[in-house]
Regions:
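Catalytic cysteine-centered active-site loop
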Residues: 56-107
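Glycine- and charge-enriched low-complexity intrinsically disordered segments
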Residues: 150-161
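Recognition helices and adjacent regulatory flanks at domain boundaries
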Residues: 47-51, 57-58
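...with weaker cross-activation on analogous glycine-rich loops/strands in unrelated enzymes
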Residues: 36, 85-147
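Stable alpha-helical elements in mature extracytoplasmic
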Residues: 42, 46-49, 69-70, 74
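Bacterial Sec signal peptide processing site at the extreme N-terminus
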Residues: 18-42
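Sec-dependent bacterial lipoprotein signal peptides
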Residues: 1-24
Length: 161
């Protein structure tokens, strides 16, 4: 066997072993990548998810097309489209990854809002201006971050991949 091919195969096996050990040892509050996704693919995957879920009704605690809440939609999107395991709740999702400014938003960044004294909301940035989320009034929709309501309630943005 060609030594270059053998060397690459050894690096892949070693890398997979390291990833497996790291995933088992990782704290539960971090996102765990099943496979990395390129940024250009993220936007396409998000639009695929949006098209499949568009209009799905909001249901607190929901995790299906019969009804889904905001953190459930984020959880399912990351799992099914991006191959990453995120925490299930908005609060726990808000504690993972790295903070980014709204001006630095990229497709796949999580955007968090404080919509009431003890109420949080989460969506996924499609770009610097729009995000997809499970809205209580409209179900799964794309909204503008330029909207006054979303600008006033924006709490933070986080990059988890």
């Amino acid at each position: 066997m060609n030594s270059v091919i053998l060397s690459r195969a050894c690096r892949v096996v070693l890398g997979l072993g390291i990833l497996l050990v790291a995933a088992c040892a990782a704290p539960p509050k971090s996102a765990q990548a099943v496979h990395p996704v390129e940024t250009t693919t993220v936007e396409s995957a998000l639009y695929d998810q949006y098209q499949a879920w568009q209009g799905t009704a909001y249901r607190y605690g929901g995790m299906s097309k019969a009804g889904v809440d905001c953190s459930g939609f984020v959880y399912l999107t990351y799992r099914d489209q991006l191959g990453m395991q995120l925490p299930r709740t908005t609060l726990h999702q808000s504690r993972i990854g790295q903070a980014v400014s709204p001006q630095q938003l990229q497709a796949g960044d999580l955007v968090f809002f404080l919509t009431g004294p003890n109420t949080r909301h989460v969506g996924i940035a499609l770009d610097k201006h729009r995000f997809v989320h499970a809205s209580k009034s409209k179900g799964v929709v794309v909204s503008s971050l330029a909207n006054d309501y979303w600008q006033q309630t924006l709490w933070q943005a986080r990059r988890v991949y």
